[in-house]
Structure formats: structure tokens, C-alpha cells
């Protein structure tokens, strides 16, 4: 995230500022971090589609086919 030091000993960032605004902008929540969440979700979705496709392929060509 940003280079600001957290006031908490374990490095947490408070969810809200004293005036009620979010402590971290929404844009930063989706684009900062070790890996962006959208990238992880895209890779996971592609993996699920691949596995489901593999099952359908196997059902037509493998032991389960008539």
C-alpha cells in the first residue's frame, strides 16, 4: 500500500477515518497488494472453466462414452 506507517503495532490500517471517510480509497483496495484481486479472480475462473471443460471432454471420449 502506501509508505505511511500504521499507528497500530501489528501494521493494521483502520477501516474508517475519524470523519467517517474510508481510510483506504476504493481504487487502492482493488489495485494494490501482493497480487491484485481481479488478477487472482480471473486466473481462478479460468482454472474452473478448464477443469469443467476437461470433465465434459472426458465424458465424451473416455470410459464413460458409449
Swiss-Prot record:
Annotated localization: Cellular thylakoid membrane
Membrane topology per record: Single-pass membrane protein
Transmembrane segments: 37-57
GO cellular component terms attached to this protein's record: photosystem II reaction center; plasma membrane-derived thylakoid membrane
SUPFAM superfamilies from the UniProt entry: Photosystem II reaction center protein J, PsbJ (SSF161021)
Protein name as catalogued: Photosystem II reaction center protein J
Gene name in the database record: psbJ
Entry keyword Membrane: yes
UniProt organism field: Parasynechococcus marenigrum (strain WH8102)
Spans annotated as Disordered: 1-23
HAMAP family assigned: PSII_PsbJ (MF_01305)
Biological process, per Gene Ontology: photosynthesis
Pfam families assigned to the protein according to its UniProt record, in alphabetical order: PsbJ
